[in-house]
Amino acid sequence: MHARVVSMEIRPMDIEEANRIYQDLVVPAAKEERGFRGALLLTDPYTGEGVSISLWESEDDLHASEASGFYHRKLDQLDALFIGTPVRKHYEVSVQEV
């Protein structure tokens, strides 16, 4: 399993709106992508710091979601709420317990 981790800063007054967009638009669309296995959005309502973690069955599935434009379309939906540019990294999931 592989993870895309996106670190971001959101204006604290916009955290609730970011949560709504992620829950109502980003996650349902991600469920339609091949290999999608789950997502988390972690936010600090005081500082505006946030981390999005999406889980993918394989590295190929993760990269396919970027090549298809899915990742950038979803990022664009949140763009007006960001301070600065989000930082994206990829990881192999070493341990998972749910």
Feature locations, PLM:
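Short S/T/G/P-rich N-terminal loop/turn motif that feeds into the first structured element of a domain
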Residues: M1-G50, E57-G69, L81-V98
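Low-complexity, intrinsically disordered Gly/Pro/Thr-rich segments
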Residues: R73-Q77
